[in-house]
Amino acid sequence: MKVQASVRKICENCRLIRRRRRVMVVCKNPKHKQRQG
């Protein structure tokens, strides 16, 4: 899980979602997991 100031999609499988007021990226590739914070 990468914690970044700005999250972006890395590939076409990445999905931007909001959980508990946090913007997160979920993907089938675990390296692409990110959250904003």
Curated annotation (Swiss-Prot):
Question: What gene name is given for the protein in this entry?
Answer: rpl36
Keywords, alphabetical:
Chloroplast, Plastid, Ribonucleoprotein, Ribosomal protein
Q: Please give the GO cellular component terms listed in this UniProt entry.
A: chloroplast; ribonucleoprotein complex; ribosome
Species:
Chaetosphaeridium globosum
What InterPro entries does this protein's entry cite?
Ribosomal_bL36, Ribosomal_bL36_sp
* Database matches in PROSITE patterns: RIBOSOMAL_L36
Cellular location(s): Plastid, Chloroplast
Which coarse location class applies to the principal site listed for this UniProt protein? plastid
Family, according to the entry, reads as follows: Belongs to the bacterial ribosomal protein bL36 family.
Keyword DNA-binding in the entry? The reply is: no
Q: Which GO terms describe its molecular function?
A: structural constituent of ribosome
Q: Which domain of life is it from?
A: Eukaryota
| Transmembrane annotation, as ranges | none
Query: SUPFAM superfamilies, alphabetically?
Result: Ribosomal protein L36
Q: What is this protein called?
A: Large ribosomal subunit protein bL36c
Biological process annotations from GO: translation
Give a Pfam family name: Ribosomal_L36
